[in-house]
């Protein structure tokens, strides 16, 4: 029993050290390639990712019939492919687990496709919480 508890604790600690919890200013810097794309400002993205994933690059949210992955919570029904949804449209032509690492390059490429196809309203948090009063989402320490 003790070895099971030890193994469980090691597993939890290992997972915690792999997770990437970004700060507001880190997100601001990381998303510079999205500045103005689709008419969306950086403060809007900082706000949207905060309310979508809490700046956690390894955030996974399971819904009834789909799962959303990463900083941008990209859905496996349409945009990426995983074992849960092997018949996904996979418009971004990528495995969903690629959205769970610290390299946001592929995430941003997919986000641009989402913006081109459906716009910023794909992210419900944007319309509800991030379309005005954006001063708090600026980063002074660039």
UniProtKB/Swiss-Prot annotation:
Keyword Calcium: yes
Subcellular location: Secreted
GO molecular function, one term: lysozyme activity
SMART domains noted in UniProt: LYZ1 (SM00263)
Keyword list, A-Z: Allergen, Calcium, Disulfide bond, Glycoprotein, Lactose biosynthesis, Metal-binding, Milk protein, Secreted, Signal
Cellular component GO terms, alphabetical: extracellular space
Keyword Manganese on entry: no
Listed transmembrane segments: none
Gene3D superfamilies from the UniProt entry: 1.10.530.10
Alphabetized Pfam families for the sequence: Lys
Glycosylation sites: 64
Signal peptide boundaries: 1-19
Tissue spec. comment: Mammary gland specific. Secreted in milk.
One BP term from GO: response to progesterone
Annotated positions binding Ca(2+): 98, 101, 103, 106-107
Positions of the C-type lysozyme domain: 20-142
Disulphide-bridged cysteine pairs: 25-139, 47-130, 80-96, 92-110
Subunit details: Lactose synthase (LS) is a heterodimer of a catalytic component, beta1,4-galactosyltransferase (beta4Gal-T1) and a regulatory component, alpha-lactalbumin (LA).
Protein name: Alpha-lactalbumin
Biological source species: Bos taurus (Bovine)
Lineage: Eukaryota, Metazoa, Chordata, Craniata, Vertebrata
